[in-house]
Amino acid sequence: MSFFYSSAYAADKRNFDEIDRSGFNSFIKKKKNFDEIDRSGFDGFVKRNFDEIDRVGFGSFIKKSEPHH
C-alpha cells in the first residue's frame, strides 16, 4: 500500500512540476506587463486623485479634529 501511494505521489509531483513551470512562466510574463501598465498609468492616476482628496477632504478632517482653545 505504501509503495503504491509513494509512486502515485511521485507521478503527481512530476506532473505538477511540469504544469507549474509552464503556468508560472506565463504568469510572470503577465505580471511584467501589468507592472508596465501600473507604472505608466495607474500610479499617476492614483497619486493625482489621492493628492486632490488629501488636500480637500483629509485636510479639513484634521482641522475639524483639532481641539479649540
UniProtKB/Swiss-Prot annotation:
One of its GO terms (biological process) is neuropeptide signaling pathway. It is found in: Secreted. Transmembrane segments: none annotated. One of its GO terms (cellular component) is extracellular region. Residues 1-12, 29-32, 59-69 form a propeptide. Its main location: secreted. The keyword Secreted applies. Keywords: Cleavage on pair of basic residues, Neuropeptide, Secreted. Myotropic peptides. Belongs to the orcokinin family. This is Orcokinin peptides.
